[in-house]
């Protein structure tokens, strides 16, 4: 026969990690994960915005600008770069260390509980097999790095805030925007 008896696609194995566990090993296998809506239920930026509003650490004009840009982006009227660059401006003049600490605190207080257990298991399965695991996100470092550390992901790819020689944020994003 011409292979008609071979099922295509092959039958799926049951369980979220079964296919990874049955697959090849080693760092030549890449596993790429997105952050918001994939590893995490919801959006890490929303958790940060809520926290900053509660602490009165975000001026109303900044908040309204970000909301307006987010709506315009969703409607296809603004580029994503405009939204992410506006977000970076809200921390201009602050110490990078403080913004990173804020990200860690928000992760512990709200984002850690939003990580899907099935996705955590899938990340762990890839790590057990020795795969190269990457967390790729358009979010900012202070949102992505805590999740990557928590999950033991060594390769986060995300947008990074620019700091000057004293560690003060300039309000810019390293180019190119991810």
What are these regions (language model features)?
Residues 1-22, 26-28, 101, 108-178:
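C-terminal cap/substrate-recognition subdomain and adjoining C-terminal extension
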Residues 36, 75, 92, 137, ...:
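Short glycine-rich loop/turn motifs that provide flexible caps or phosphate-binding loops at active sites
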Residues 45-48, 81-84, 166-172:
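Acidic/polar active-site rim loop that often engages polyanionic ligands
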């Amino acid at each position: 026969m011409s292979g008609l008896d071979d099922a295509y696609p092959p039958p799926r194995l049951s369980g979220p990690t079964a296919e990874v566990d049955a697959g090849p090993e080693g760092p030549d296998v890449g596993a790429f994960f997105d952050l918001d809506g994939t590893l995490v239920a919801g959006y890490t930026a929303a958790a940060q915005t809520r926290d900053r509003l509660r602490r009165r650490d975000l001026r109303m004009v900044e908040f309204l600008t970000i909301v307006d840009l987010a709506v315009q982006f969703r409607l296809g009227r603004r580029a994503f770069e405009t939204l992410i660059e506006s977000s970076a401006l809200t921390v201009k003049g602050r110490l990078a260390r403080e913004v990173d600490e804020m990200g860690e605190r928000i992760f512990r207080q709200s984002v850690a509980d939003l990580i899907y257990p099935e996705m955590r298991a899938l990340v762990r399965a890839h790590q057990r097999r020795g795969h190269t695991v990457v967390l790729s996100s358009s979010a900012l470092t202070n949102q992505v790095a805590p999740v990557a550390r928590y999950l033991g992901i060594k390769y986060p790819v995300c947008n990074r805030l620019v700091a000057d020689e004293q560690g003060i944020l300039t309000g810019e994003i390293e180019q190119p925007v991810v």
